[in-house]
């Protein structure tokens, strides 16, 4: 069994809008995650950020992991940015099918054909990568179409089509705060992601029943990912990225990590009041 040292850090993200001191509650989450990962054969990267307060944690937060189908969040965001700029609409048709339908298939059912149709329409992998870089998203690489990704020999440590956990959470943060797409487009995107049909045994599995989750999974041989938003009981949203490669029982590991994150951030709400950050309306 290959052992991977786990580097834990509890700091504000470089790109986060606020700098928040680490609380003892999140330190305990680090310890729980450290114990959890020590018992796992998979290599796991985690990042989580309270979008209201800026409190954050990460495990291997700066290590690239293959995105698999979680790249579809970036494809959707670029298309919606083009909608916001008047270049496209969700009612446009491509190959006889509306973009709205293609978006649903791509994000809800992780349909690879629909993803590649939208990939091509926004300009391909290079266009998505360039858009992320131009908007200050560092740590994400987009190199291949989904068809190319599936056809190529798979290497769990290939840095093509990869993201660090922190970079993925930064993408989610900026989507949520309306920095990459409009509030209207953000609400549409989160509404579709809330219907995600894949990965029911991952991020959502061990959360309390009824917990709102908007997420996108990624799966390849030896890879299991889940990224998105978890809404806490008081309405705070936590942006979460969990990547797992190699080893066994990766979905269960993702579910356990998500529950530890949920419980840890929930304890923060007993602390003195922290005002919510203003988000785009």
Where are the predicted features?
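Conserved catalytic neighborhood of penicillin-recognizing serine enzymes
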Residues: 88-128, 156, 161
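Structured C-terminal helix/loop/strand segments within mature extracytoplasmic catalytic/sensor domains
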Residues: 22-33, 64, 121, 170-200, ...
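Soluble periplasmic/extracytoplasmic beta-strand elements of cell-envelope proteins
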Residues: 45-50, 58, 74, 107, ...
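Bacterial N-terminal signal peptides
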Residues: 5-15
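Mid-domain, small-residue-enriched loop/turn segments at the edges of structured enzyme/sensor domains
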Residues: 119-177
